[in-house]
Amino acid sequence: MTLLLSIILLASCTKTEIEYRDVEVPVETIVEKIVTQTVTQTVNVVTPPEEYSFTRNGVSTVYYTGQSARLKMATAIKSAMNDQASTKTNVDNMFNNGTGFSDESLNSSGKKIGNKVGTSGSATVKPLFDEWITEFTTIVAPAVNNSITATRTIAGSYTEADGSRTVKVNAKGFELNQILSKGLIGALQVDQIINTYLSFTKLDGAKQDNDDDIYHYPTDGSAVPYITKMEHYWDEGFGYLQGLDNQYAPGLGDASIGRDGANLNYYLNKINGQEKEVGITKRIYDAFSAGRAAIVAKDYEERDRQANIIGVELSKVIGYKSQYYLRSAAGKIGKGEWADALHALAEAYGFILGLQYTKAADGQPYLTHAEVNEHLSSLSAGDGGFWDRTPAELTTMADQLQQSTGLSE
């Protein structure tokens, strides 16, 4: 019994060995192959020219004769509004019908100013110009012809004691040719440039035609159209600034071709001489050139960027000059130089009217129509109007405009 048990126990303790062998197993490997493919894409790159010159098939596509005509009309109307021989019928025809000018080319141009005044804003602005024409020709001019000396509440002519200046004014001291001509700088030129021809609504309305290269306008003397609507709209905006000056360079051209102080570009170049705005004429000119090149390249984002530059920079002319002439008038009143003071106040009045057509960096005008009217009412308050103003009042108003525009010389 004992022997058998021992055998069983020994059998239970026997060790089992495990044999390991190397076995070849197939492995699937995934390899990514990078393939480089060259894709050619045509991109229009905007390269603005150094001068405002654009051609197609060897023919110029720049065309703004209508704007040049209107600027010449503005100059002639300014002169007529200082001529006591002018009649209401004559000046009204010049302004509203585009006739009655000594320059026959203007009479036959088919252009006029009246229907282009203040078109982007309140309908109450254009009638002001008609009222000024009526008042000068029916009240001021007859008073001057009758040798009436102007004073508070009395229309006529007023000459500085030293004979340096004579102004022809209404009963409130308004020198109406200055109010009208400076008013046109904002309500005609700035408004047409910023709020009409360079507006995104106007330009984008011609986008499809520009994309499809559909030409609508011939260059002068050509029967074949070479110009798209959008190109022409941009040129018209350019023409309202540069129409009496050199197309191929910023700044002022030869005065012999009709340039006058009734012109926006004339005052822009005055601003260019200020320390803070040196180079503003070239900035605006280059923006016009770059924007036009962008239209040719169909780069509308770049076009809009340049339009914004033009709007903001051009508006500075109205912003600076509106406050400048208020301060100038304050100084002249302080010296008792009333002819100079009335002249400066008329210029201030016209420029303030234009503030509603400006475009600040935020896209809004410096002043709304209502805010402009508040300033104009303050400036003309009382029976004596300009005659009643004090240096303190004018300085306060200039300070307010400086704050509204963010501009200081």
Please give the residue ranges for each predicted region.
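Mature extracytoplasmic or organellar-lumen-exposed domains after removal of signal/transit peptides
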Residues: 43-409
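Bacterial Sec-dependent N-terminal signal peptides
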Residues: 7-57
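Sec-dependent signal peptide recognition
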Residues: 1-4
